């Protein structure tokens, strides 16, 4: 045990991934740990050693996994787990939380961004209550929008990494409500000319109210795919392609925006 769970030895292995079973997660990103007989990690010290080893490891990751609900069909995602025992005390260092509904990349996010990312991977029947609780506690903006029906239709199966010439790899996935800050940064990287051609009028700011309306997609008639570069959880959005089917259902409007640093990507979107 002392050899296997030595964080220095673990850290010598590049890309070491520590997968830790969780019992509960709250919207602040805090985790209550799961304890069971079948765990490889037998105690809290081994867990901390595994965690520290992943932190030391080059490109290492710490992933917490849990089902969205327990065996009694009660939610494992809470507004707060402050009163739960066996809490993990390094929530700022958690890279990912995984459920059967997706992955929340938490690295470097604010509390508000964490809350939105975690709500997106909670059980669909629990999301609206979590959202309203987060607004009441002022974790989210008072005017924050959340389209419950659209969240149920999120096309989780669309997720693909494509390699391009020059060693460039881009991950394509559907846009999320929690992409607000990333999409705002992308907007401010555009020239005035690019903004005009995309939105057909001049825009100098992209406030929260306007951006969140754009991000809350009605998946029944709209598709929005973003492209990300960089390590998972640390990547940045460099592009978005969107189509909107008209009311007749016979035609659609298509718009593609690409970070000017990556000009030439638009034709790849059409093939994707």
What function would you assign to each model-found segment?
Residues 1-145:
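Conserved phosphate- and dinucleotide-binding cores of soluble alpha/beta proteins
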Residues 151-272:
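Long, contiguous binding/interaction regions
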């Amino acid at each position: 045990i002392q050899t296997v769970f030595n964080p220095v030895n673990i850290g010598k292995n590049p890309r070491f991934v520590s997968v830790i079973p969780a019992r509960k997660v709250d919207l602040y990103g805090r985790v209550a740990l799961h304890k069971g007989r079948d765990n490889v990690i037998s105690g809290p010290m081994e867990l901390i050693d595994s965690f520290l080893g992943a932190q030391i490891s080059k490109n290492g990751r710490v992933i917490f996994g849990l089902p969205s609900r327990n065996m009694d069909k009660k939610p494992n995602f809470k507004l707060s787990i402050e009163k739960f025992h066996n809490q993990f005390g390094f929530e700022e260092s958690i890279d990912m939380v995984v459920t059967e509904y997706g992955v929340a990349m938490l690295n470097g996010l604010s509390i508000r961004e964490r809350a939105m990312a975690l709500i997106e991977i909670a059980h669909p029947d629990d999301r609206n209550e979590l959202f309203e609780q987060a607004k009441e506690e002022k974790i989210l903006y008072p005017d924050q929008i959340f389209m419950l029906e659209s969240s149920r239709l999120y096309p989780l199966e669309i997720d693909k990494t494509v390699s391009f010439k020059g060693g460039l790899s881009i991950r394509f996935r559907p846009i999320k409500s929690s992409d607000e800050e990333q999409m705002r940064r992308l907007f401010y990287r555009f020239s005035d000319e690019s903004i005009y051609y995309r939105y057909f009028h001049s825009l100098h700011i992209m406030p929260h109210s306007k951006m969140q309306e754009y991000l809350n997609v009605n998946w029944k008639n709209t598709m929005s795919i973003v492209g990300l570069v960089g390590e998972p959880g640390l990547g940045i959005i460099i592009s978005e392609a969107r189509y909107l089917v008209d009311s007749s259902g016979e035609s659609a409007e298509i718009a593609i925006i690409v970070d000017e640093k990556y000009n030439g990507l638009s034709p790849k979107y059409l093939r994707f």
